[in-house]
């Protein structure tokens, strides 16, 4: 599982791009239009996902000099907030495309890709940080956020500049994809 996790960690973005392109091709081939209802459902999911990603990246990336695991901000409630954000973005894109049959496929592919990635990352971080990280992962959930924050939060803070420095590519990709889906609808 660790070898698969390392491979999926290195290739996860490429695989998600391929999946999104597949959605576009299938939508276009089957003459799917991107309805207003689809947009009304997908837009909040995409915004939620991107907001979670910005928050988590802003906390994680702005404090690289700390020699302790990040357990503040969204990491106090969930071990993998960036991946949860990515999940909501991907789900929003699938719904935007109007391919409801793709939802179970997306769920399966997402977890097949990210579960080994997370196992690999957690193994790497446990070796790097030792007992503090092992205690953290035994307390904080992996996928579903906890209402009660982790009691031993780190001093990591959120810096918006760092968040947008890392996330501008994802934001542009989402905007570009939304524009492309809109154009495909109008061209039909």
Residue ranges and their predicted role:
Residues 75, 80-85:
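Glycine-rich acyl-CoA binding loop
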Residues 1-72, 87-188:
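Membrane-anchoring alpha-helices and their flanking helix-loop junctions
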């Amino acid at each position: 599982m660790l070898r698969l996790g390392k491979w999926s960690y290195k290739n996860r973005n490429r695989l998600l791009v391929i999946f999104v392109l597949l959605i576009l091709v299938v939508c276009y081939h089957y003459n799917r239009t991107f309805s207003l209802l689809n947009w009304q459902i997908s837009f909040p999911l995409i915004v939620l996902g991107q907001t979670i990603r910005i928050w988590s990246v802003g906390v994680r990336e702005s404090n690289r000099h700390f020699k302790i695991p990040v357990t503040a901000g969204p990491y106090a409630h969930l071990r993998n907030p960036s991946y949860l954000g990515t999940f909501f973005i991907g789900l929003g894109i699938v719904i935007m495309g109007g391919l409801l049959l793709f939802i179970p496929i997306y769920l399966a592919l997402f977890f097949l890709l990210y579960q080994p990635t997370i196992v690999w990352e957690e193994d790497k971080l446990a070796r790097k940080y030792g007992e503090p990280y092992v205690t953290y992962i035994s307390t904080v959930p992996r996928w579903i956020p906890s209402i009660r924050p982790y009691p031993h939060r780190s001093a990591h803070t959120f810096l918006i500049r760092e968040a947008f420095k890392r996330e501008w590519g994802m934001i542009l990709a989402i905007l570009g994809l939304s524009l492309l889906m809109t154009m495909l609808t109008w061209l039909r």
